[in-house]
Amino acid sequence: MKVNLPAFERAGVMVVGDVMLDRYWYGPTCRISPEAPVPVVKVNTVEERPGGAANVAMNIASLGANVRLVGLTGIDDAARALSKTLAEVNVKCDFVSVPTHPTITKLRVLSRNQQLIRLDFEEGFEGGDPQPLHERINQALGSIGALVLSDYAKGALTSVQTMISLARQAGVPVLIDPKGTDFERYRGATLLTPNLSEFEAVAGKCKSEDELVERGMKLIADYDLSALLVTRSEQGMTLLQPNKAPLHMPTQAQEVYDVTGAGDTVIGVLAATLAAGNTLEEACYFANAAAGVVVGKLGTSTVSPIELENAVRGRADTGFGVMTEEELRQAVASARKRGEKVVMTNGVFDILHAGHVSYLANARKLGDRLIVAVNSDASTKRLKGDSRPVNPLEQRMIVLGALESVDWVVSFEEDTPQRLIAGILPDLLVKGGDYKPEEIAGSEEVWANGGEVMVLNFEDGCSTTNIIKKIQTESEK
């Protein structure tokens, strides 16, 4: 099925809400503390990521949309870290600084793919003057196609009714990720996106689909909403609108590692898609696909356009895992956070045959993820001669990506993938044939990083060159 992504580059969105910084400390756990019955984590990696409303803005920016973020911060290192990180991904920050309060920060300690503890550093922003937030919203209304109110009950949205009114008067849809059980404060919003627990805390426990629909429609009527989207974890999503049949969408998640920030991804994709001019039903379709991608990553994460396109088209149609170098680096970083062993190989793979398939399957068995780096058409021509490749790069990558053993496919322009390998630094570099390990491009860089290099045998009798010669011989008869 041909699926066109929304014109995200034309979308303008403002996000207003509770901004926070997510800190992650990673390290191995090898012993119990003598001071208390708790594990000792030897921290070797520290990461900082925008969270809360800032993660919503990150998700919108990652799609290529134009986004402005408004929220409350302190005047501290956390606020500066947020501004710097967000500016690097093209999020325009317009924070209101509150000297008496720290920027909300959440610290998570992780070891062996498990979160051991979370520490929150915060003081609520309730009671502050909301006028600076209102002024920023008013200034942006003429240039945005959607307003997102990201509520984590930290004080940025105490005047949410005024914000809704300002946007609706300007004809701008208001999307809200709600918090708590007081949905009266969201009266008049275009769309609420509660998860199932949040929905049932307000509407009551639902024993069936029909009951969920009935109670959801009552909430829409009670609070003058235009629509309600209930996110239901492994059961997918349900969109409810007045005078329309319910739209149930099954989950698209293949693996679930972490649901942190998944709600931010959903509302971010919804807003960007609506602001690009698509319908609400289309926006939900793309948001559901994006949620299936992001829960397969560790921590608050975003979804790139190519990941979203792969998700909505499906593996068989797109060559799942065909990536740019930057997208591959991000995918590898996420895999390593999950403790996965990354294997990498390379080749032309012009006419895929049984030998290739067997070799790649064996390579995949040596780790958790397999990267295949493919020579570009120009690189192949220099290596194999003017008559090659038989199949252009795009087709070769699609075929490789369709193999169950292959996770990610990337191309390179040079004669060898040495530069690419040095940038990825796989845990294991493999090559087929009769090479010596030290002859393999990238081996020195992998060894220097503590990785391994291995040579695997090809299946006897399988050769692209022999296949081409046989075809030529048969055609001459």
From Swiss-Prot:
ATP binds at N195, L196, S197, E198. Disulfide bonds: none annotated. Keywords: ATP-binding, Carbohydrate metabolism, Kinase, Multifunctional enzyme, Nucleotide-binding, Nucleotidyltransferase, Transferase. GO terms for cellular component: cytosol. The active site is at D264. It catalyses: D-glycero-beta-D-manno-heptose 7-phosphate + ATP = D-glycero-beta-D-manno-heptose 1,7-bisphosphate + ADP + H(+); D-glycero-beta-D-manno-heptose 1-phosphate + ATP + H(+) = ADP-D-glycero-beta-D-manno-heptose + diphosphate. GO terms for molecular function: ATP binding; heptose 7-phosphate kinase activity; heptose-1-phosphate adenylyltransferase activity; phosphotransferase activity, alcohol group as acceptor. Its EC number is 2.7.1.167, 2.7.7.70. It comes from the Bacteria. Gene3D superfamilies: 3.40.1190.20, HUPs (3.40.50.620). Residues 1-318 are annotated as: Ribokinase. GO terms for biological process: ADP-L-glycero-beta-D-manno-heptose biosynthetic process. Pfam families: CTP_transf_like (PF01467), PfkB (PF00294). Residues 344-477 are annotated as: Cytidylyltransferase. Pathway: Nucleotide-sugar biosynthesis; ADP-L-glycero-beta-D-manno-heptose biosynthesis; ADP-L-glycero-beta-D-manno-heptose from D-glycero-beta-D-manno-heptose 7-phosphate: step 1/4; Nucleotide-sugar biosynthesis; ADP-L-glycero-beta-D-manno-heptose biosynthesis; ADP-L-glycero-beta-D-manno-heptose from D-glycero-beta-D-manno-heptose 7-phosphate: step 3/4. PANTHER family: BIFUNCTIONAL PROTEIN HLDE. Homodimer. In the N-terminal section; belongs to the carbohydrate kinase PfkB family. Catalyzes the ADP transfer from ATP to D-glycero-beta-D-manno-heptose 1-phosphate, yielding ADP-D-glycero-beta-D-manno-heptose. This is Bifunctional protein HldE. It comes from Salmonella dublin (strain CT_02021853). The lineage of its organism: Bacteria, Pseudomonadati, Pseudomonadota, Gammaproteobacteria, Enterobacterales.
